Structure formats: C-alpha cells, structure tokens
Amino acid sequence: MPLELTQSRVQKIWVPVDHRPSLPRSCGPKLTNSPTVIVMVGLPARGKTYISKKLTRYLNWIGVPTKVFNVGEYRREAVKQYSSYNFFRPDNEEAMKVRKQCALAALRDVKSYLAKEGGQIAVFDATNTTRERRHMILHFAKENDFKAFFIESVCDDPTVVASNIMEVKISSPDYKDCNSAEAMDDFMKRISCYEASYQPLDPDKCDRDLSLIKVIDVGRRFLVNRVQDHIQSRIVYYLMNIHVQPRTIYLCRHGENEHNLQGRIGGDSGLSSRGKKFASALSKFVEEQNLKDLRVWTSQLKSTIQTAEALRLPYEQWKALNEIDAGVCEELTYEEIRDTYPEEYALREQDKYYYRYPTGESYQDLVQRLEPVIMELERQENVLVICHQAVLRCLLAYFLDKSAEEMPYLKCPLHTVLKLTPVAYGCRVESIYLNVESVCTHRERSEDAKKGPNPLMRRNSVTPLASPEPTKKPRINSFEEHVASTSAALPSCLPPEVPTQLPGQPLLGQACLT
C-alpha cells in the first residue's frame, strides 16, 4: 500500500507520514550514509590540525554535521603544565599512560557524537603514527558500525616544517612561557620522539584495504586508495583543491540598484546613481590595492556586471553567483509578500535558512549551488567577487565558519568591501566602507526565529543539519590525579571482563588504543 505523504511547508518537499521511531544509528554500514571517522595520520607540524579544521568547516557548511576531536586538547586538559619534549619520549611510561587515556577519552566522545548526538563525521586529530594504533582505531570503527577514512599528511621539506612550527606551534599553550628559539628547539625534539616509531600508510602492501588519501608536500602530490562512498569522494576532491599560498579574497555586493531603493527583492534592475558612484569608488580601491593578476567574478545579473564594468578589468560571469531565487515573491517588497502570502512570510521568518520560496530557492539550496564557487575560490590566489546579499552571506559563512542558523543574518552592507586573509586556522576579515551612501537592506532576526529550531524539520533528512555545537571540554583526570591513582600500565585492549575506563565515561567495548 502506498505511504501517505505530507508536504513540508518550510522546505516544499514531500515526506512520508510516519510516526515510527527513526532507524537506529547502530545500523551503520548497512546504510549508504553511515557515520564516518576521519583518522588523521602524520608527524607533528605536518598540517594535520590545519586540514582537520578546514575540512570540518567545509563539511559543516555543505550540511554534513562534523566535529574535530583533537587529542592534543585532551592532553592539555589532563596535563595542566607542559614541561618539555620528555613527555613524548617512548620510554616515559607514566606519560604514555596519560596519552593513552587521552586518546581513549577522545574516542569515547567520538562514539557519543556519532551514535547519540546526530553527528555524521568525526575527525580524530592525532599523530596515529604506528600501524598498531591505526589498527585499534579501525577496530573501534568496525565495532561501532562506523566507516573509517585515513588522511595522512607527509612533508619532508624542512622549510615548510619550520614555517608550520613558527606560525602555529610556538603560540601553543605548551610554550606560553618560552621564547621562539626555546619553543622551536623543544618542538623539533618532540618530533624526533615520534620519528623512530613512525610507520607511514602503505597502500601497496600493509594498508591496501584501507580507505585513505596521502597528501604529499602540501598538496604537490596525492595518493588515493579505496574510496568507499560519495562523502569520501567529496573529501578527496576538496583536499585536492585547497592550497596554502598567501592570497587575499575580496567580497562585495553590487552597487545600490533601483530595486534596493524600492525595497524589492530579486529581479534584475540596474544601478542607481549612488550605485554608479560606488562602482567608481571600487575601481579606485582596486587600483590602490595594487594586486597582481587579480581575478574578478560577477553574477549574470545586470547590477554586478555594471559594477564590474567600471573596474576596466577582465571579469568572468558565474550563473552560480546569481541572487537567491525568490520564486513567486520575485520583485515584491516584504510588505507585499506579507499581505499577499502571509503564511509564506511567517514560515520564512520562522526558519530563514531552510525556508524555500514557492517555485524558488532556500539558503540551503543556495549553499549547494555555490559549492563549485567555493572549490574554485580555494584554488585561486587574489580574487574579487561581486555578488548579491544572500550569496555573500553564504560565502562569508564558509570562510568565517558560521552555522546554518547564523548565515541568513550575517551583515553584508552595500558599498562595503570585505577583505579576507587566510591565516593559520581560519580567516581574518576586514570591513572597508567606500564612503558612498546607500539604503540598508539588512533585516534582523525575528522573535519567532530566536525561539529555536523549526519543529517541522526532520533530523533524518537527506541533507543533515549543520552542527553548531562547540567542542566539549575533555572529561579526563589530570596527570597528577592519574599518577596518584594508578601505578599499572593500561591494558592493550578492553575485554569485557576488564572494565578499564575513565571516571564518568561509558566503555568503548573491546576497542582501544595502545
């Protein structure tokens, strides 16, 4: 018998009327979209945390709930005061016990996130340099019905390694009381502690059955093995497009247009007189930046093209950069929408990210449309993107790691250039107003939207919700508490009859780290 269907008023999609409980996450690998553990591999200062954070930002932006579990943060929570590289020596038995506990604590939180908290991907950010360690993580994934995907960052260029240490590691809490030279010397000795036991991934022999990608020399070469599914292929594609070369991305809206003056949304109107002044001011601004080989991108709508024409530079038109399609509400004012389509107006106020205009788009649709633009932006060096308000919000949310809930309310005023400069683990933004007046098109979040997520949304939809949850503080004993409470080494596994666990945490089962 055919299932009864009902249409989601917010997303305008058909869903079955089914009040049965959703499928348990433990069905894992039997499902195409089962949770995945991404396992980072590599020596310190090889960019693992950079890749982890950047990849997590991308996956959350496209709607795949993802979270990083950095074992170093768990270790810093356990060991309140870092002394020296001696903590990482393989013959330091007490420290080894604490490091194992930290890894176990992180894996417990990985399990909780993927099995109970609605997460889809967990990034296990640690060195994981031995085959034995990786085998245990793989066993943990299989036992919990998670897929495992390994990302190894390999770099033998001493200049790149030294640059990574100077840019990121010396500012780490581990070295807050050290000068640069002392921090560099200690960290190089820390790397040496790992090098003796480092076993790289070997897809030709020992690791031929693993799903993995090796990123070699900061993206100069890649080695990919046994990609299992669509999301892993997207991860591979993303990693092959990013680079670490210094560059600047400029984002701005078109100059004020006639519809902006009238308070109308969408359409394809030309620039107002003030919009033309902004185009001239933008041309002068670009000249002052003195950028070599600046690329200029616009949408296919008149206002962005007129703005770009004033620059007297070559520009490329992207259909993907067109403004959000308002469907039946195109070229209406918000007051006209409220009077003509009161229910649609109320639904959009309630959930602006997921709301889809009748015969039009939602912000969620817009993110999917803009993914090729993000990929190409990651490949480029200096770029100026002239676009529209909703489009600019989506792009800015990606670079600033904003959640789906925040995205539709980001302030992107007319006649202002946003200068984005990538830094170690994020992006620095500078807002530059070009001193040309304009109307304000920003609308604050309504009180209804502030009350919480839309109860009509389904958590098991095809595109999962983004996960704005912050990383939990590691729940482990301090180093001092550990030394005082135990003198025996942790067992090399967790059999059911030996319930070794951290206080206040559930057991992982049989899987553990060594």
Curated annotation (Swiss-Prot):
Q: How does it assemble?
A: Homodimer. Forms a heterodimer with PFKFB2.
Instruction: List residues modified as Phosphoserine.
Output: 461, 467
Keyword Phosphoprotein annotated: yes
What segment(s) does the record annotate as region Disordered? 444-475
Pfam families (alphabetical): 6PF2K, His_Phos_1
Modified residues annotated as Phosphothreonine in this record = 463, 471
Q: What does the record give as the organism's lineage?
A: Eukaryota, Metazoa, Chordata, Craniata, Vertebrata
Enumerate the residue ranges of region (Fructose-2,6-bisphosphatase): 246-514
* GN (gene name): PFKFB3
What is the species of this protein? Pongo abelii
User: This chain belongs to which protein, by name?
Assistant: 6-phosphofructo-2-kinase/fructose-2,6-bisphosphatase 3
Q: Which residues bind beta-D-fructose 6-phosphate?
A: 75, 99, 127, 133, 169, 190, 194
